[in-house]
Structure formats: structure tokens, C-alpha cells
A protein has these predicted regions:
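Short acidic-glycine-tyrosine-enriched beta hairpin
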Residues: 121-142
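Double-stranded beta-helix
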Residues: 50-52, 126-127, 146-177
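A short, N-terminal "cap"/entry segment at the start of jelly-roll beta-barrel domains
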Residues: 44-85, 128, 170-177
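N-terminal secretory signal peptides that target proteins for export/translocation
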Residues: 1-26
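Cleavable N-terminal signal peptides
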Residues: 32-33, 43
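Glycine- and acidic-residue-biased ligand/ion/polar-headgroup-sensing regions
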Residues: 92-95, 102-122
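Short beta-strand His + acidic residue motifs that chelate non-heme Fe in jelly-roll/DSBH
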Residues: 97-99, 117-118, 139, 144-150
Length: 177
């Protein structure tokens, strides 16, 4: 058995083995536990997608509600239907997303690059915070926020569909141009 360097062996000294009245009863408990795990796994399998690496993701242009230049790939669910979804948005350096909000909470994790996000009614680069690779942010439903990039950036967005975006200033909506 290997013990991770991050866990001190002394921490394991307090763990006592489970006492069993017989090897047969222990075997029965293990088999029962395995059956529970397998049946739960089978139920979840229909909802799971195959694991994939970044190179296997299919990218395409973001919907017209996003400024030109962004690409998107949907990893799970359908953002435009009721239910959970996960997508990734790839933006070039200098990309700007004017102040907007969503009817549901938006959760964003930075996969790569530098993603700047701020709260307010107008994009103001002095009011934002920079999130770097691994950074996380969330915008509650209907909270006005804006974003921009300083390098090519990929963010993962997850939330509850249907996804919608409403620009604070309707003239900022690229789908109306």
C-alpha cells in the first residue's frame, strides 16, 4: 500500500479495523456494497458522456448573442433547454463582452488565459478582477456583469438552462446588428 506524501502516516494510527464476527459475513457485506455501487453506476451511465480530451472537442462559432470572434463547445446538456449544462467558451485576446445578465446563475471556471470580470451596468476595465487559469467566479441570476480578455482565453460555464443573455444597453446586443 502506498501512502501519499501529503498525508502523515500518524493520521492513520487512529483508524481501527472493522471487527467482524466471521469472514463470511464480511464477504456478504462486501458483495452487497458492490451491488449497490454497480446498480447506481448503471443508472448514471445513460447520462454520462465519454471522457474526452481538449483536442477531441468540437468547437464552432458562438451563438449570435455573443460578440463575433468567440467559439463554443457544449460538453453536457443543452444550454437552451431546461436542465443543467456545461459549455466552454474560447475568446481571442482583446475580446469584450458588454454589460449583461442572465435569468439563471452563471458559474465560470477559467481553463486557460486571463478572464476579467466585473459587476455593473457598463463595461469598465477599472472595476473588474482578473481571473487566471483555475480561477472561478459566479454571477447570480439577473446580476449585471461584463467581461473581457487580455489573452486567448477558454472558460467553462455551467448552469441551469435555458441559457439566455440580456444586454443592459440593447444596442450592445450583437444579434440585433
Amino acid at each position: 500500500m502506498t501512502i501519499s506524501n501529503s498525508v502523515a502516516p500518524a493520521q492513520f494510527s487512529a483508524i481501527k479495523p472493522v471487527q467482524s464476527d466471521s469472514a463470511a459475513s464480511m464477504l456478504c457485506r462486501l458483495v452487497a456494497g458492490a451491488c449497490v455501487v454497480l446498480s447506481a453506476s448503471a443508472a448514471l451511465a445513460d447520462d454520462m458522456k465519454m471522457p474526452m480530451n481538449g483536442k477531441e472537442m468540437n468547437w464552432g462559432p458562438a451563438p449570435p448573442a455573443f460578440p463575433k470572434g468567440a467559439q463554443v463547445t457544449v460538453l453536457s446538456g443543452d444550454p437552451f433547454k431546461d436542465g443543467p449544462y456545461v459549455l466552454r467558451l474560447k475568446m481571442p485576446a482583446g475580446y469584450k463582452l458588454p454589460a449583461h445578465n442572465h435569468p439563471t446563475q452563471e458559474n465560470v471556471t477559467v481553463i486557460s488565459g486571463n478572464f476579467h470580470i466585473g459587476m455593473g451596468d457598463k463595461l469598465d476595465e477599472k472595476k473588474g478582477i482578473e481571473l487566471t487559469t483555475g480561477g472561478y467566479g459566479e454571477a447570480p441570476a439577473k446580476m449585471n456583469h461584463f467581461a473581457w480578455t487580455t489573452s486567448t482565453t477558454v472558460v467553462q460555464v455551467h448552469g441551469q438552462g435555458p441559457f439566455a443573455i440580456a444586454y443592459v444597453d440593447p444596442t450592445d446586443d450583437p444579434s440585433k446588428k
